Amino acid sequence: MKTFTAKPETVKRDWYVVDASGKTLGRLATELARRLRGKHKAEYTPHVDTGDYIIVLNAEKVAVTGNKRLDKKYFHHTGHIGGIKEATFEEMIARHPERVIEIAVKGMLPKGPLGRAMFRKLKVYAGNEHNHAAQQPQVLDI
């Protein structure tokens, strides 16, 4: 019997909605990354994007344990000399709440073109509204 490998054109992708309110950031991100890769499916193939689309709501209400609200730092560089910028978790939640979840999930996905394709299937929103009603997403309880 031959080993089954999924073909990109035959993969069935579903849409899911996840509410991030009160969920721990890392535990939520690992489950999102797992589902974006498609590891929860029987037809998972490492070199094919078999994952589902995921909509994350209430990103501003995601939780972190311990003192990470003040201690966790996010860095980026402007491109100019001495242009390293840092922001705490609390500052990031105030300015760009979606980015906190996006950064956490992106770090857990493969690096390269396949990982970028998987990451594009993640839609994160700060509030409770999204514009993907036409896709009829199912509620995913994590």
From Swiss-Prot:
GO terms for biological process: negative regulation of translation; translation. GO terms for molecular function: mRNA binding; structural constituent of ribosome. CDD domains: Ribosomal_L13 (cd00392). It comes from the Bacteria. One of its GO terms (cellular component) is cytosolic large ribosomal subunit. The keyword Metal-binding does not apply. Part of the 50S ribosomal subunit. NCBIfam families: rplM_bact (TIGR01066). This protein is one of the early assembly proteins of the 50S ribosomal subunit, although it is not seen to bind rRNA by itself. It is important during the early stages of 50S assembly. PANTHER family: LARGE RIBOSOMAL SUBUNIT PROTEIN UL13M, RIBOSOMAL PROTEIN L13. This is Large ribosomal subunit protein uL13. It comes from Edwardsiella ictaluri (strain 93-146).
